[in-house]
Amino acid sequence: MEKHMKVVAFERQQQGTGASRRLRNAGKTTGIVYGGEAAPQMIELDHNALWHALKKEAFHSSILDLEVAGKSQRVLLRDVQYHPFRQLVLHVDFQRIDPKKKLHTKAPLHFLNAETSPAVKLSSAVVSHVVTEIEIECLPADLPEFLEVDLSKIEAGQSLHAKDIALPNGVALTAHVDAENPVIASATIPAGAVSDEAAAGEGETPAA
């Protein structure tokens, strides 16, 4: 049986700025659950538990099992509002999912094998990750926790694009990402290294 991360929340009766401030002072964070055929639902969550959950990548990219008043529903985390300078979560948004409808979301990218690539081993290039997530569409049951990007064959001066990602069955890039095919990683030789190589070449004395 497929398991999902569980989130426990409580129905929120009071609304407004004053009520939200009182909840924060009591160690709670406000939230909302929307989508599907049910009406939007105001909720509150334990702040510390939520703070630690938000540090996990899977919490942002996986289907969650949200329990409110003893009833469970499948949701995706859609938005998080943080305090501008304090370690404080102000508000979270969850969206209900329909197992029969495709969803659009962002999947984290995990870059692998850069250190064994020709770009790094042969050219001392620097491999840069241009993006760290990509927009995809799939049915909820096919949602990957992350996507792997194999950099083992990248050479200096080359770039990898979105269409180079090996997508699991049932997963596709969203239409606009597929059309734009953006760069996701590139391998470049640092300017200093190029200058050093040129200087070394100029300093060599031709053989008599």
UniProtKB/Swiss-Prot annotation:
This is one of the proteins that binds to the 5S RNA in the ribosome where it forms part of the central protuberance. Part of the 50S ribosomal subunit; part of the 5S rRNA/L5/L18/L25 subcomplex. Contacts the 5S rRNA. Binds to the 5S rRNA independently of L5 and L18. This is Large ribosomal subunit protein bL25. InterPro entries: Rbsml_bL25/Gln-tRNA_synth_N (IPR020056), Ribosomal_bL25/Gln-tRNA_synth (IPR011035), Ribosomal_bL25_b-dom (IPR020057), Ribosomal_bL25_C (IPR037121), Ribosomal_bL25_long (IPR001021), Ribosomal_L25_dom (IPR029751), Ribosomal_uL5_bac-type (IPR020930). One of its GO terms (cellular component) is cytosolic large ribosomal subunit. The lineage of its organism: Bacteria, Pseudomonadati, Pseudomonadota, Betaproteobacteria, Burkholderiales. The keyword rRNA-binding applies. Pfam families: Ribosomal_L25p, Ribosomal_TL5_C. Belongs to the bacterial ribosomal protein bL25 family. CTC subfamily. Transmembrane segments: none annotated. The keyword RNA-binding applies. GO terms for molecular function: 5S rRNA binding; structural constituent of ribosome. PANTHER family: RIBOSOMAL PROTEIN L25/GLN-TRNA SYNTHETASE, ANTI-CODON-BINDING DOMAIN-CONTAINING PROTEIN, RIBOSOMAL PROTEIN L25_GLN-TRNA SYNTHETASE, ANTI-CODON-BINDING DOMAIN-CONTAINING PROTEIN. One of its GO terms (biological process) is translation. Keywords: Ribonucleoprotein, Ribosomal protein, RNA-binding, rRNA-binding. CDD domains: Ribosomal_L25_TL5_CTC.
